[in-house]
Each structure stands twice: as C-alpha cells, then as structure tokens.
A protein has these predicted regions:
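Active-site-adjacent loop and "lid" segments of alpha/beta metabolic enzymes
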Residues: 2-4, 9-10, 25-44, 63-81, ...
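Glycine-rich phosphate/diphosphate-binding loops that line cofactor/substrate pockets in enzymes
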Residues: 9, 50, 189-190
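Structural motif
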Residues: 14-16, 192, 224
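Catalytic domains of carbohydrate-active enzymes, especially glycoside hydrolases
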Residues: 43-59, 260
Length: 289
C-alpha cells in the first residue's frame, strides 16, 4: 500500500530538513538562542522549502551525547508556537515532530503535524504507538540502545559509546522488526511506517560505518528507510573535522545511503543534499526513450 503522505517513495529520494528549537544542538544550529525564535524558524523553513526540502523535522529536545532531557511542558512550549505558525504560513508542508513523548506527539498532531519521529522506536513511552495510531499519522521508528551515561566528549564533539553487538546488522534489523510489530499491534498502518537504523546512537565509529555499509540489508523488512548521518560524530572522527566542516563527509555518507536503499535523508544542509539526491536519482532512474 502506498504512503499517501509521501507518494513517490521508491521513485525519488525525499529530503527532510532539520529545524532545531533548542539552545544546545550538537550541530550548533539551535534556534532557541534567537530572540524571536519562532520567526527565525519560519525563515529557515522557507529557505528549506525554496531549496527543495520535502519534509520539515522539528525538534525541541537535543539528542546530542550528554544532553539534559527536558520536560514535556518545556518541549511543548517550544514546539507548539512554531507548529501553529508553520501550519498557518505553509498549510501543505509535511511536518515531522522529533519526540519520544506521547503527550507531546498528541498535542502536535492535533495542531496539524503529519509525522512522529521517535528516536526510541516506540520503546520509551508506552502510550506513543496508540497515540500515533489514533491520529492515523506516519511514524519513523529509530533503532536506539543508547544509555545516557555512555556519552563521550572530545575536541571533535560528543559521541555515544557503543553497545556490544555480536552481529550489529542482524540485531538492528531484528530490533526494528520488533518495533514494527509493536506499532502494528497498536493500530499503526504498515504503509505509514518508516525505519531508521539510528546511525550515531549507541554505536562506535566502526559500528556506524559498518551498519551504513550494510544498510541495504534493512530493506528486507519491506519498509522505507530514513538515514540520519548529517554532521554526526562518526564523520568528524573519521575525517578529523569539527562539526562545522563535515559537509563533504555528510554528502558522501548520504550518497552511499541513497545508492544502497535509503529513501529519506534527514539533513542540516538542505540545498547541497537536494542537489546530490536529484543527480543520483537522475542517474538511478534514467531510461532511454
């Protein structure tokens, strides 16, 4: 069954632009430091759409290694004014909310959000799956076995210590399959499920690279794949570069992902990634008249 929200899945690469409504994003682009962060978020959204972005992903809680969790109240105070403004200014844009809290998801869906992007794959909040199902929303389920105490900091930025895996690709795939079962049992339609391997979460540099290398093996599950590698620590540590200089590494990782099964790219650098994806799609789907 086709996903009506993203009808060209499998025929084009979708680009999801990251809008961080935080003061402490790892990428340094958190908008909460701005005096009028709502207006700044709207301007960033407008630029993203002009550059070819397909989906806007709003997050109000930093997931960088070592970040302090925030309350649902604080999360909603940051998110709802922007969601309402975006819905008023851009009624047709696809809106994704990066949250793992059911109460936050419910409030944002009531204001017109389309997608819930849960970094815990419905494993954190027992009410999340049912909340998404009742709203008939699309769900992004990310693999994540991170423990908060496992953050490691260095001059190249924070990263998470890896979890021990005997076979990381198989274990990630099995974990995601269980997340799908959890979602479907709660009433989420299978055509509204997207999977994310969770690059950068609870994985070593080597594990991230190996999982990315074998991302095509996740296609066996039969669901669209979202890839989120933009500016992440494994790129910085591989290239010995701070987060502000990771564009080329991010583009390389995203290109590999597209060529090996990724359907959606979650990125900070929208314009450059849109051009990359359009060129790759032109080559991949080319036919002679």
């Amino acid at each position: 069954m086709k996903n009506q929200l993203l009808p060209e899945l499998g025929k084009k690469t979708y680009i999801m632009g990251i809008i961080n409504l935080t003061p402490d994003s790892f990428s340094g682009d958190g908008l909460l430091r701005e005096r009028d962060y709502i207006r700044t978020a709207l301007l960033q959204a407008e630029h993203f759409i002009q550059d070819g972005c397909d989906i806007l992903d709003l997050g109000a809680e930093s997931t960088r290694p070592g970040a302090t969790p925030i309350s649902t109240e604080d999360e909603l105070n940051r998110l709802l004014p922007v969601v309402r403004s975006l819905r008023e200014e851009m009624p047709n844009v696809v809106l994704s909310i990066d949250t793992y809290k059911a109460e936050t998801a419910r409030a944002c869906l009531e204001e017109g959000a389309d997608i819930i992007n849960d970094i815990w794959g419905f494993r954190y909040d027992p009410d999340m799956a049912g909340t998404v199902a009742i709203a008939n929303a699309t769900a992004i389920l990310m693999h994540n076995r991170t423990q908060g105490a496992q953050a490691v900091n260095s001059e190249l930025g924070g990263r998470y210590e890896g979890v021990k895996y005997d076979d990381i690709v198989t274990e990630v795939r099995d974990w995601l399959a269980e997340a799908v079962d959890l979602a479907v049992e709660a009433g989420v339609r299978p055509d509204k499920i997207i999977l994310d391997p969770g690059i950068g979460f609870g994985k070593t540099i080597e594990q991230n690279l190996f999982l990315l290398k074998h991302i095509d093996m996740l296609r066996d599950l039969g669901f669209p794949i979202l890839l989120g590698v933009s500016r992440k620590g494994f790129i910085g540590h591989t290239l010995n570069l701070p987060q502000g200089e990771r564009l080329e590494g991010s583009l390389a990782a995203n290109a590999w992902g597209v060529l090996h099964g990724a359907d959606i790219l979650r990125v900070h650098d929208v314009k450059e990634t849109v051009r990359l994806a359009r060129m790759l799609d032109a080559i991949r789907f080319s036919e002679l008249p």
